[in-house]
Every structure is written in C-alpha cells, then in structure tokens.
Amino acid sequence: GLMSSIGKALGGLIVDVLKPKTPAS
C-alpha cells in the first residue's frame, strides 16, 4: 500500500546514507 511505498523510499534513502558506495538501482 501507500505506507509500503513510503517505507521503500525511506529505506532506499537510508541505504544510500549508510552505504554510499552502493550504486542506486
């Protein structure tokens, strides 16, 4: 649902912050 989409987006941003070396897919 909408919350899941938001969670995915936030999770992606967090991953970018914690693992900047990981290229965004």
Swiss-Prot record:
Q: Which GO terms describe its cellular component?
A: extracellular region
What name goes with this protein?
Answer: Aurein-5.2
Q: Which InterPro entries match?
A: Frog_Litoria
Instruction: Keywords in alphabetical order, please.
Output: Amphibian defense peptide, Antibiotic, Antimicrobial, Secreted
The subcellular localization recorded is:
Secreted
Q: What does this protein do?
A: Has antimicrobial activity against L.lactis and S.uberis.
Its BP terms in the Gene Ontology are:
defense response to bacterium
